[in-house]
UniProtKB/Swiss-Prot annotation:
Name the record gives this protein: Putative transport protein Ent638_1362
GO MF entry, a single one: monoatomic cation transmembrane transporter activity
Keyword check for GTP-binding: no
Classification via PANTHER family: K(+)_H(+) ANTIPORTER SUBUNIT KHTT, TRANSPORT PROTEIN YBJL-RELATED
Record-annotated RCK C-terminal domain positions: 202-288, 292-373
Entry keyword set: Cell membrane, Membrane, Repeat, Transmembrane, Transmembrane helix, Transport
SUPFAM superfamilies, alphabetized: TrkA C-terminal domain-like (SSF116726)
Organism: Enterobacter sp. (strain 638)
Record has Transmembrane as a keyword: yes
Gene Ontology biological process terms, A to Z: potassium ion transport
């Protein structure tokens, strides 16, 4: 039995799609030195190669892929988008605007200089910025721009070609810039990170390990009574000195939860909760006493929960003002927009921030009720909310504005992005509404993007040979310029106009480029995770601006003549 693989793939779009995805994902795992190709470029390269052999795919799959991707981008950005946009993110908003705006202007200028069409120009912008939201926004706007037939087909093919030719150079050049640009400016990044650490009282241990608190019990003997010297627990300040917290006391056979006015007495059995190293810092009077193995005293359900910040008495306040330790709770992590932040007492909390807190289940629940709600650990997605907001996004995308002879449609990309932002924002404010597990959201977003990349690659592959010979070297030069020049402009603006701390500035610049590998290099150079504060500040807003840039470049292009 002979099987013609080419006929089999041509006759089955679904099989072809998953073959492209599988081969592309394998290719994406390859590394060039320290740089991994990545899933997007792997799938795009494989689809371009198969497209040259005249394989094609149904465009409906391509459209669904980009819709799912851009909607999920909005859902991720939603919890923090409005707080950054309206309140404490002026510098971050301005940096993201400068980065994206300068790249857009430079790309338009180079496109006109080299005589390209809008497809190549928009694709070059998307690839140079390593930004699939630009590609998605531009592709959707092209389909609603009034182009038809072969003109639209050529523009879409050139869009994916420009992206493919410049993506890798955009990624590599940004990583090189992240490695060497901090060394070319006069302020040492590590010194800048230490400076802001001193100002804000940050933990300078960037590799801090997170342990679950443990509970141990001791009997109060003469040494401990003498050490306490009649002071109550508040005056002793055991937590301030060691990091341990007295959770329970058994006195005369009766279990009680002590308050700050309690005084240790001879024969008391006390249960202390704290991290292992905190127990090691206890006064010898504790350790020299008799350790007690009292099942009831030690029977405490230590839990670790993720608390979403929501309530007005927590939003806008500094982390230290929550006084978690006064309530017997221990903070493990602070997460903003899926990015782990330094545990900084002076970090101002935004609505939607996630605090990972450990402690007695009852105490953690009390703290959660005070500042927000415990994140649902269900693995069930609220598909009704997902579908409803997806429909709303599509309906918003159908809106068209007419100005004399010029009409402008919102488009699916902008509509779905806005609907996703609203779903994410509402989820951050209402714990039982619109829940989507992060793993499910990541899977849908990644799958949608890969389907979209496979579609554009197969569509563009047939003409890549001719186009590459005509514009190849121009694309590489333009890609390098659009990748690096906005970074330099953004640095000068942030350093000399906004006068930002350099560690925060470089983190914010990488966030404006939504490039995690470059962010890791900045953190390594600074030997600190302080740049993550800046990265989180610009990341959410940049994703939105990059999508709009893809739309704007298509709208602006005809007016440039």
């Amino acid at each position: 039995m002979n099987i013609n693989v080419a006929d089999l793939l041509n006759g089955n779009y679904i099989l072809l799609l998953f073959v492209v995805l599988a081969l592309g994902l394998c290719l994406g795992k390859l590394r060039l030195g320290s740089v991994q190709l990545g899933n997007s470029i792997g799938v795009l390269v494989v689809s371009l190669l198969l497209g040259q052999q005249h394989f094609s795919i149904n465009t409906d799959a391509l459209n669904l892929g980009f819709m799912l991707f851009i909607f999920c981008v909005g859902v991720e950005a939603g919890p923090n988008f409005f707080s950054i946009f309206f309140r404490d993110g002026k510098n971050y908003l301005m940096l993201a605007l400068v980065m994206v705006g300068s790249a857009l202007i430079i790309a338009l200028g180079l496109g006109k200089l080299f005589g390209w069409d809008i497809g190549l120009t928009a694709g070059m912008l998307a690839g140079s910025m390593t930004s699939t939201p630009v590609l998605v926004g531009a592709g959707d706007t092209l389909r609603h721009s009034g182009m038809e037939g072969s003109q639209l087909s050529v523009a879409l093919d050139h869009l994916s070609l420009g992206y493919a030719l410049t993506y890798l150079i955009g990624l590599v050049s940004l990583i090189v810039a992240a490695r060497y640009l901090p060394k070319l400016q006069h302020q040492d990044l590590q010194t800048s990170a230490q400076q802001i650490a001193r100002e804000r009282g940050l933990d300078t241990d960037t590799k801090r390990k997170v342990y679950l608190p443990v509970i141990r019990a001791y009997r109060v003997g003469p040494e401990l009574v003498a050490w306490a010297d009649g002071k109550n627990l508040r005056e002793l300040g055991i937590y301030r000195q060691t990091g341990c917290y007295i959770e329970r006391i058994r006195r005369n056979g009766i279990l009680a939860n002590p308050d700050g006015d309690a005084v240790l007495q001879m024969g008391d059995d006390i249960a202390l909760v704290g991290y292992p190293d905190a127990h090691a810092r206890l006064d010898p009077s504790f350790r020299n006493g008799k350790e007690v193995f009292d099942r009831d005293l030690l029977d405490m359900r230590i839990v670790t929960e993720e608390i979403v910040v929501k309530n007005h008495n927590a939003v806008g306040r500094r982390l230290a003002q929550l006084k978690l330790t006064d309530h017997g709770c221990f903070l493990n992590r602070v997460i903003r927009s899926q990015i782990e932040m330094p545990i900084d007492d002076n970090v101002v909390l935004n609505k939607g921030d996630v605090l990972q807190v450990s402690g007695d289940a009852r105490r953690v629940k009390t703290v959660a009720d005070r500042i927000g709600f415990i994140s649902i650990h269900s693995q069930v997605t609220d598909l009704l909310a997902f579908c409803a907001f997806f429909i709303v996004g599509l309906m918003i995308g159908m809106i068209t504005f007419q100005f004399s002879n010029f009409s402008f449609g919102v488009g699916n990309a902008a509509g779905l992005l806005f609907a996703g932002i609203m779903l994410g924002f509402l989820r951050a404010n209402h714990p039982t509404f619109g829940y989507i597990p992060q793993g499910a959201l990541n899977m849908v977003k990644e799958f949608g993007l890969m389907v979209f990349m496979a579609g554009v690659g197969l569509s563009a592959g047939s003409g890549i040979g001719h186009s590459l010979g005509a514009v190849g070297w121009q694309m590489l030069v333009a890609g390098l310029i659009v990748s690096l020049l906005p970074v330099v402009i953004c640095f000068l603006f942030g350093a000399y106009v906004l006068r930002m701390n350099r560690a925060m500035l470089f983190g914010a610049m990488m966030g404006a480029r939504t490039c995690a590998p470059a962010m890791e290099i900045i953190s390594d150079t600074a030997r600190s995770n302080i740049p993550a504060l800046g990265y989180a500040g610009t990341y959410a807003i940049a994703n939105v601006l990059l999508t709009l840039a893809g739309t704007l470049i298509i709208i602006i292009w005809p007016g440039l003549g």
